[in-house]
Amino acid sequence: MREIVHLQTGQCGNQIGAAFWQTISGEHGLDSNGVYNGTSELQLERMSVYFNEASGNKYVPRAVLVDLEPGTMDAVRAGPFGQLFRPDNFVFGQSGAGNNWAKGHYTEGAELVDQVLDVVRREAEGCDCLQGFQITHSLGGGTGAGMGTLLISKIREEFPDRMMATFSVVPSPKVSDTVVEPYNATLSVHQLVENSDETFCIDNEALYDICMRTLKLSNPSYGDLNYLVSAVMSGVTTCLRFPGQLNSDLRKLAVNMVPFPRLHFFMVGFAPLTSRGAHSFRAVSVPELTQQMFDPKNMMAASDFRNGRYLTCSAIFRGRVAMKEVEDQMRNVQSKNSSYFVEWIPNNIQTALCAIPPRGLTMSSTFIGNSTSIQELFKRVGEQFTAMFRRKAFLHWYTGEGMDEMEFTEAESNMNDLVSEYQQYQDAGIDEEEEEYEEELPEGEE
């Protein structure tokens, strides 16, 4: 089977990761101790992608939990699914990274990284045919961002031909935890551009908006936000976990989604969005799902795709869905919104189907889009970065850990390059059209 090894680093990564394991354990019919008591053969068929079968009919996640302080780990261990994980796979330091990327990447994190790699190696050796790695982390802090990117580059060195997918929580404009988020995020993106194959961008503000607007929660907790993220993660990985008519794995997804190697930052969405308690009391149809899925309000990253164009996108439908209906809907979306799709990649919507819906729903869909409007997100972080870096504010925290200002300058220019690459492809048309257009302009201008 094509296994995936999952890593979660830092507080945010561990909380999202815990929600993800809770969600998929439920989908595969596992209780909180990893014992199978499901009803469908399909739940077992590809269980081994994420779970290792231990003795006594118990399934153990292929998960490695990493943090530089013990706090979050204790919370995961004490949480509802704490007994699911293999105790040896908790790797933690004592000192914490204090929201400092340099500590996570160069000092504290670097001391712990070999211990983590040992566990990763052990998990990888337990696989028949390892497909790749997925990592959940945030880009704004110290451990998830600094140590997370360190792990990614180390794993890249050791497993150069395996896929690397990241679920990265990007700092959002309104919801900020720390002042130095722009530094940490820019330094992280600098790493992700080079070392990740696909990065799913999630941001807290967009999640808050979805909770308030669509789910009608007046005061959303992190639990509610994590629930949304885990729904998307479950959707993105459905095709890997269940048999379906049209299955894709991480590599197929990348082949279809990444036209240029650096442009692998995706926006994600999910439908139907229903609040946690009220599992929808109405029937859901494919057109409805499609409409909600392409709605800018449902994107989990704070950038509006109407300000850019889609290079590629992928839709994953779950439940009893007719292939033809899905394809018609997709064609429909593309022809209605053709201005939001680049015309130089024909058929740039890819669809996948899976027969098993998430718990409590009859059907659902997950959306993954590679849109040039994601540059808004990087632009925003870049502007905040420049504002602070120009004054060299807070730099001593980083240089004190042995970093060089040069590295900041490089990260900044790499991020600016990324933004202009997205812009370049947003403006690019098909050459012939552009030439005709230029000839027509003079007489038809006024």
From Swiss-Prot:
Organism superkingdom: Eukaryota
The keyword GTP-binding belongs to this UniProt entry's keyword annotation: yes
GO biological process, one term: microtubule-based process
Chief localisation class: cytoplasm
CDD domains, per database record: beta_tubulin (cd02187)
Keyword set includes GTP-binding: yes
UniProt entry keywords in alphabetical sequence: Cytoplasm, Cytoskeleton, GTP-binding, Magnesium, Metal-binding, Microtubule, Nucleotide-binding
Residues at which Mg(2+) binds: E69
One Gene Ontology molecular-function label: GTPase activity
Cofactor: Mg(2+)
Role: Tubulin is the major constituent of microtubules, a cylinder consisting of laterally associated linear protofilaments composed of alpha- and beta-tubulin heterodimers. Microtubules grow by the addition of GTP-tubulin dimers to the microtubule end, where a stabilizing cap forms. Below the cap, tubulin dimers are in GDP-bound state, owing to GTPase activity of alpha-tubulin.
Subunit structure: Dimer of alpha and beta chains. A typical microtubule is a hollow water-filled tube with an outer diameter of 25 nm and an inner diameter of 15 nM. Alpha-beta heterodimers associate head-to-tail to form protofilaments running lengthwise along the microtubule wall with the beta-tubulin subunit facing the microtubule plus end conferring a structural polarity. Microtubules usually have 13 protofilaments but different protofilament numbers can be found in some organisms and specialized cells.
Protein name: Tubulin beta chain
Organism field: Gibberella zeae (strain ATCC MYA-4620 / CBS 123657 / FGSC 9075 / NRRL 31084 / PH-1) (Wheat head blight fungus)
Gene transcribed to yield this protein: TUB2
